[in-house]
Amino acid sequence: MVDLQLHQSLGHHNFTNKLTFYVNGVKRTISNPDPRGTLLDFIRTHEGLTGTKLGCSEGGCGACTVVVASWDREQGEIIYSAVNSCIVPLVAVEGKHLITVEGIGSSNNPHPAQERIALFHGSQCGFCTPGIVMSLYALLRNTGGQPSKEQIAESFDGNLCRCTGYKPIIDAANTFSCGRPGGCCRDNASGKANGAGATVGNGMANGAAAVANGNGAAANGCCKGNGAANGCCKSNGSAATTANGDDKEVDMNKLFTPNGLPLKPYSAKTELIFPPALKKYELNPLFFGNEQKVWFRPVTKLQLLQIKHAYPESKIVGGASEIQIEIKMKAANYNISVYANDIEELKTHKYIPGKGLEFGANISLSKLEEVCDKLVHELDPNVSQIYGAILEQLKYFAGRQIRNAATPAGNIATASPISDLNPVLVAAEAVLTVESIENGEEQISMTDFFVGYRKTKLPAHGVITKIFVPETVPRNEVVMAYKQAKRKDDDIAIVTACLRLALDDDFRISKARLAYGGVGPFTTAAKGTAEFLTGKLLRRETAKEVLEGAIDCLIKEFDLPYSVPGGMAAYRRTLIMSFFYKFYSTVLEKIGLAGEAQDNSALENTYDPQALLEVTRKHPVGSRDLTNPYEQRIVGKSDPHLSALKQVTGEAVYIDDIPPYHGECFGVQVMSTKPRARILSVDPSPALEVEGVVGYVDVNDLPSREANIWGPTPVGKEPFFADGEVYYVGQCIGVIIATDRMIAEEAARLVKVEYEELETVITIEEAIEAQSFFDYQPKAEKGDVDGAFAESAYTFEGTSRIGSQEHFYLETQGSLVVPEPEDGEMKVYSSSQNPTETQVFVAQATGVPSSRIVARVKRLGGGFGGKESRCCHLSSIAAVAAKKYKRPVRMILSRSEDMLTAGQRHPFVMKWKVGLDKNYKFTALEAKLYANAGWSMDLTKGVIERAVLHAENCYDFPNARIQGIPCRTSVASNTAFRGFGGPQGMFMAECYIYEIADQLGIEPDTLREINYLVPGVSSTPFKQAITEDFTVPDMVKQIKKQSNYDDLRRQVEEFNSKHKWIKRGLAHVPTMFGISFGATFLNQAGALVHIYHDGSILLTHGGTEMGQGLHTKMAMVCAEELKVPLSQVFISETSTNTVPNTSASAASASSDLNGMAVKHACDQLNERLAPYRERLGENATMEQLAHAAYFDRVNLSANGFYKTPDIGFVWGDPNPKPAFFYFTQGCAVAMVEVNTLTGDWSNLRTDIVMDIGRPINQAIDYGQIEGAFVQGQGLFTIEESLWLRNGALFTRGPGAYKIPGFRDIPQEFNVGHLRDRPFKHLKTIHRSKGIGEPPLFLGSSVFFAIRDALSYARRQNLGEATMPAGLVAPMTTERIRMLAGDSLYEHKGKIEPTEGDDKPFFVNA
């Protein structure tokens, strides 16, 4: 409890509890607001502005981004700061102007940023979009609407999108770039055209001509260097080049999208004005709260010191980036918080010539970045080195939103062992000024500030007020900063360092400071190594000895055990050495001891100039092939997503945006903390005593024990509530129901559960050893496998491993259940891909027929398979609570809860054996595919079946035996994920292609070409005949020509021959994905079409909209068939009371199934309207036709239905029907660049060609291709799920789990489709093809390109002609570094387990 009586020492300061600020131009004065909430809570709950979304609660995804505008009195200007409202406290906007996405535009009058993202197809599910819009808005306001491309790129580094692949968002933003669609000429953009029929950079147009957004150097040079013939792009719109190659002046008032839609010009004059009253507003000290928590907001340093003196236990808050995470994730309780970011005295900065930089402890990191950048450009480079090091670290420090709010003092005082900034301050010998009422002002050196894990020398009453960073001396001093993470931008460090050496005029080392983070419990200086270096003379003849000695010292100082907390022991040790090796070469270069490297052994080289190089990172460019010979009146056009403008303006409604119902409660699960245990007792009584708690539900509140068992398949059963035992960390034991979310969360933690722990199995290897398998083990078999192996000229065996992948849909699982007063009826609003199963299981859990449950789905904020079955559980337990308490119940999972409980993509271990004849043609395949199913089967049956059915990819095996074996483990049930087992099976196929080609000494493409399936001849291992639908070889030819593949290979060879540490790799990968549900009965769909008097049309179908554009495509089909404009067709939602018994929106079949059902309904209506069309003429409007038909009593409503013909595969049938209606195929070429010294890498270029048939909407299909590819790239490279040894998932949020960001996409991204095909064989809706899942596997091309790059490194370093067998996906930076084969790792970096220390810290399930 907090004493609300203000401490007597503070009484004279006139504290107030009233907060005054503006929201979207409207003044707000709030008295004593709820102290528990964040700014986001206020925006959504108090203001009802639900456009700003909650995505993660830790400032890692950017969905909650808003803009805070403030008046900078010192500069006399308005600063627009994008911030994460999910972590920033409400007090942070006092005296400022808060701008949300609703404040800048509406769907009827969108802001140019909103409109361009919408019309460039930059919004799919839309949940992330408002945050992205606001990041761009802040940039436009701060740059006057003319940002550079580099500014655009860095402005998005705190935003994530899981759908689009980012490219269309970047292209939309590029239209603002200094008046030039290709970007500002100072960004070195060129006007390179991409040929007829293609637009580069998603295309911009001036009139009808598409303007290219090229790559490389500007044709006319930068206007700043007087190279541009037409003057500065900022003044007149720079010369750009059209697709026809003609220079053309770009009029920024006449911009168009690729398909000719005009764009609204940007004018700063029409922007929301900054409230004039705020320029004069005087901040007053604040004190508000309740008995649980209070906030102070001092406005002077003295007030802050006095508060800290009166309340030494108080927590000082700057950006709240660390504190809010501790509150949310660790249930930390900071009863007294002090917001210190409005104290101007703590935000000053001054450079003292000849001495250094002094800055206030609470200057924002963005401002510090700006200050250091200015010093780096203005001072002698030797003097400004330390500021360059700070700048280098800040560049990749979190995201822009965090840097706008976070402060140096917060970063220092938090004492994180992986801080990016602290090693620089330690190496710089920075001095902290610490003040307190007791001791006044004192100085503490950063060199000995940290004394333990999260412990410092900061006194209990002390406040850091200033930081002084000395400048480096003008001569013979070198400072460099380094950081390595899993993802380059917005990621926590694995190892970070700042290394500093000073030498005298004889090049004798006079001082050394080597500060490392990520290698111990706190930021540590390598004092022993510094002592070794001090006094050493650097000469050519001594340099090698000094290098070797220093590295040996570093290894001894940072002796990381195999089981070190945080894992990656060998990688971290190798990074320690790699950073020093890079630094040492920098030192030798700067003091003039540069000499050519003598050979390829790291420790043999005294000076290695190539160690200084970094991987190439450029602003993304690329092309989309926009030719479409099959475009019809509506179908085939690239219309934007129907909800795009609603999504970019925040008007689109998701589950948690539905206004609260009267009496609504919030539910939070009580989850198991053990992976496998008996429940001895559950005591909710402490929770029930909390004010605001309504009650508790568990298995005893179901109609029967039998009703507790549910599951999407007959073999995939599990309980709603744990009943006697728990099987994984996170399993639902019960649900606390309370009047609001925060109360429910607090109370759920108070429920007491006692366990008796049982034996656990976490990994596939452990399951194999324990024979822990589920009974269902599908097998596909064809031919005489054993006989074929006996006659094979070659036989190869191997094992392929691929890890799991988190869905990371931006909208977490959510449900709102509203009980009706009669007959047990309920309305269920769910973020579900599967409304029918939601209906079925809610009915089961509440004991009523399905007819009394209406499941409704407006849209999902992403699904990717993760909301196919797992959503049903959440809706059902919410329904149990709603029934018991007769009140609406809302349950929205936090990001941590969602990742802990909702399951992931299945990890696989796949053991294969392949036979070949003397001509290298495959003779036989035998494989066993082990999948980690988790604790229950869920949808594993279908996943492992599809993995088996895709284990040959597109290669011909006359004899095959492939078996799937699901492993029972003690982790959450793994579930459907885009590709549904297909990518794992095809990954195995490409692994054996590469490994066998290595062993045979031939190119993988040679092996592929020999073994492609042959139409009319071949059949798959599941005996489906290959028809003319097989197009992979044709696409391979097309993509190799399009990408200039042979020339790229020559470039790679040449580059690698000249570069030692940076290597390039090139790979080509095909894919062949079967389209149909594995369960034949699911291949059906229904639709309902109503035509009203006014000619408007209401369409409902069985599919759900999750960003894939299904509603848009279905509306286009309906409009095409009924011969009306697209604007006349409206889709409101998907609901079980309009179209019953639907299949989940999954398997890439939703357009096929629902499209045909829509067509069937429209055919009926057209037949009924035919007489009226004949009578009234072809030009009659639908309104006229509907009127005439109505008065003749003609039914203007039709129900359509469709079931996929000619399929019906049955496992074990010796002569089965086809498993798939057709295959969607494609191929990709990827070229990467890898830094083998650190593991860092970048995707230089990707080209994709897909067989998409005759697309219903080409732009939507391209969005699916790009988005799936980037998601697949994540699967095969940076996305790594890790478990602790106690069975708990460690990677439970964007801080620990990394998906690709804006700067991880290909730097040149070219997408096209199979050309010159009539597609007459297709029997699909308008001869289109399903596209949602098939492109995802193409992301593996990046994995194999990295493999290719590493093969060059190993050939150079070890003389090995082949790569090690059994490479593991994802190919993380750690795995890349460990595979390089250089002497630093091979001789010094390896860490072997010792007796009693044989288990790594993390587990890969």
Swiss-Prot record:
FAD binds at residues 316-323, 397, 407-411, 420, 464, 483. The lineage of its organism: Eukaryota, Fungi, Dikarya, Ascomycota, Saccharomycotina. The keyword Nucleotide-binding does not apply. Belongs to the xanthine dehydrogenase family. Keywords: 2Fe-2S, Cytoplasm, FAD, Flavoprotein, Iron, Iron-sulfur, Metal-binding, Molybdenum, NAD, Oxidoreductase, Purine metabolism. The active site is at E1333. [2Fe-2S] cluster 2 binds at C125, C128, C161, C163. Its EC number is 1.17.1.4. Induction: Most efficiently by hypoxanthine. Twice the level of the transcription increase compared with the level due to induction by adenine, which exhibits 10-fold increase from non-induced. Low levels induced by ammonium and nitrate. 43 mmol/l ammonium or nitrate and 2.5 mmol/l adenine together induce only 2- to 3-fold higher levels compared to non-induced level. Homodimer. It comes from the Eukaryota. It comes from Blastobotrys adeninivorans. Mo-molybdopterin binds at Q833, F864, R978, A1147. This is Xanthine dehydrogenase. SUPFAM superfamilies: 2Fe-2S ferredoxin-like (SSF54292), CO dehydrogenase flavoprotein C-terminal domain-like (SSF55447), CO dehydrogenase ISP C-domain like (SSF47741), CO dehydrogenase molybdoprotein N-domain-like (SSF54665), FAD-binding/transporter-associated domain-like (SSF56176), Molybdenum cofactor-binding domain (SSF56003). GO terms for biological process: cellular response to ammonium ion; cellular response to cadmium ion; cellular response to copper ion; cellular response to iron ion; cellular response to nitrate; cellular response to zinc ion; guanine catabolic process; hypoxanthine catabolic process. Completely inhibited by allopurinol and significantly inhibited by adenine. Inhibited by Fe(2+), Cd(2+) and Zn(2+) and strongly inhibited by Cu(2+). Mg(2+) and Mo(2+) have no effect on activity. Optimum pH is 8.5 in glycine-NaOH. Optimum pH is between 7.5 and 9.5 in potassium phosphate, Tris-HCl and Tris-acetate. This enzyme can be used as a potential additive in the production of low purine content food, which is recommended to people suffering from hyperuricemia that can at worst lead to gout. When used in conjunction with other enzymes of the purine degradation pathway, uric acid concentration is significantly reduced. Substrate binds at E868, R946, F980. Its cofactor is Mo-molybdopterin; [2Fe-2S] cluster; FAD. Residues 17-104 form the 2Fe-2S ferredoxin-type domain. Disruption phenotype: Exhibits less than 1% of the wild-type activity towards xanthine and hypoxanthine under inducible conditions (2.5 mmol/l adenine). No activity after cultivation without inducer.
